[in-house]
């Protein structure tokens, strides 16, 4: 009972809050003379009104000459980010792999800088991707899909010809299918995609007329769909 009351009395006498320069000097002198460990003896040996845990953390996180108090470098930031992906918020394990940094330093730097930086980079990447998706395609070529080409191949040229102004229409009825597939390719220039007719449309810029004969033969036969 007496021991418990004595411990409670000592706990009530412990000082909390910011450390003073005088307290730091007392702690450093003790560690230099007696080494680390047995932190609870500091109160009895020096009269310092700090608990053993507070003394240990003060030494490890601030007073130790092994602690790097400078700004974090880009290499350290990259290392912490990669370690955090593997270990999560296990700051002690991360700090052991970052020389000169304590777990408290790493945790504080992550919460105040790196986490916000990563969120900002992700938002910028999403915004850039969204802007790119909104831009119209420079070349759009479609033909009847394989599932519909059987029903639409007979009138594909007539439908395309009706959907554009100033387009030269190929007379499908007067020519054999093989001749149409090899020679009659219908192209129209327009900047307005609203002139599309269903899935059977050809939209290119004025400078993009050089298409290979093989591509155009496939387009005429309705076997493939091109969207570049």
Swiss-Prot record:
GO biological process per UniProt: cell fate specification; fruit development; gibberellic acid mediated signaling pathway; jasmonic acid mediated signaling pathway; regulation of protein localization; regulation of trichome morphogenesis; trichome differentiation; trichome patterning
So what does mutating residue 176 to R actually do? In strain: cv. Di-0 and cv. Landsberg erecta
The yes or no answer to whether the keyword DNA damage is present is no
Please give the record's induction comment. Up-regulated by gibberellins. May be regulated by GEBP and GEBP-like proteins.
GO terms under cellular component:
nucleus
Q: Where in the cell is it found?
A: Nucleus
Q: Which Gene3D superfamilies match?
A: Homeodomain-like
Residue ranges annotated for the HTH myb-type domain, each copy included? 11-63, 64-118
Q: Which Pfam families match?
A: Myb_DNA-binding
Annotated GO molecular function terms are: DNA binding; DNA-binding transcription factor activity
State where it is primarily located.
nucleus
At the top level, the lineage of the source is Eukaryota
Which stretches are labeled DNA-binding?
A: 39-63, 91-114
Q: In which tissues is it expressed?
A: Expressed in leaves, stems and flowers. Expressed in trichome cells and in leaf primordia.
- What is the annotated role of this protein in its UniProt record? Transcription activator, when associated with BHLH2/EGL3/MYC146 or BHLH12/MYC1. Involved in epidermal cell fate specification in leaves. Together with TTG1 and GL3, promotes trichome formation and endoreplication. Regulates the production of a signal that induces hair (trichome) precursor cells on leaf primordia to differentiate. Binds to the WER-binding sites (WBS) promoter regions and activates the transcription of target genes.
Complex formation: Homodimer and heterodimer with MYB82. Interacts directly with GL3 and BHLH2. Part of a complex made of GL1, GL3 or BHLH2, and TTG1. Also interacts with BHLH2/EGL3/MYC146 and BHLH12/MYC1. Interacts with MYB82.
What's the protein here called?
Answer: Trichome differentiation protein GL1
